[in-house]
């Protein structure tokens, strides 16, 4: 059993509290599917409630740290060196439709470097955690390791599509086609943080998506790296995918191949 640090314990407590609230609300959402209006407003309230619970719990643990959160944005802390990056509900569309594939994502950044990451899927009760230089774990006790597969033809690769209003749909379709040609096991599950956790767990060999937000990827970046995986910016190897939101996560075995295939579509 790995020893859990005090910081990670605070994150786990916050995630478990938010999870209880989200699980209750997810039960309601399943009932609301039949109504004509749908559960849209109800889900945004659920999302905000979860964010508030996480905020309170993290604040109690570390009163001086700042925050970057999906719903309420940036809160400066009195200590400028530390910042929590939080997505209270990643995979919102799944949640809204009663599809049990969504999660909570919490990361800690210290002086601009990711030091702690947690991704929690409470429906499957799978918690993925990592601490910098301390490895990545599932359910707090089993070490995570990226997959050893090296053959694109036998790989499982996940992606996410850009939204019509903000994304380059043509580019996405070119990338999708190019990857599908060499790797038939393509998936699109709709929760970027979980996609990254699954790369870390060796379930997919790779995941790529563009225009994500920092809270979608912060925890996942650290978890993938600590599981022995590679993270890259899709267009500029010097840029930080946490800032640009264009991310490729992969095991070592297919990293250069998938990068080449994606680049060939530019
Ligand atoms: P969300 O559920 O928190 O909105 C789906 O492709 C994944 O992308 C989800 O993790 C979703 O997070 C995230 N996402 C967030 N903003 C997005 C955007 N503007 N366009 C596409 N996907 C976005
Ligand atoms: Ca998200």
Locate predicted features.
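Short, Asp-centered acidic motifs that coordinate Mg2+ and/or phosphate
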Residues: 66, 116, 156, 205-206
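N-terminal subdomain of lithium-sensitive/metallo-dependent phosphomonoesterases centered on the IMPase/IPPase/PAP
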Residues: 1-89, 230, 238, 260-264
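Acidic beta-strand-loop-alpha-helix segment within the catalytic core
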Residues: 107-196, 244-266
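Short glycine/threonine-rich catalytic loop with a Thr-x-Gly-x-Asp
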Residues: 95-98, 186-189, 218
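Oxyanion/phosphate-interacting regions
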Residues: 1-13, 170, 174-181, 194-266
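Generic detector of well-ordered alpha-helical packing
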Residues: 48, 71, 88-91, 95, ...
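Glycine-rich active-site/cofactor-binding loop and its immediate structural neighborhood
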Residues: 80-123
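Residue-level signal for inorganic ion chemistry
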Residues: 22, 47, 58, 92, ...
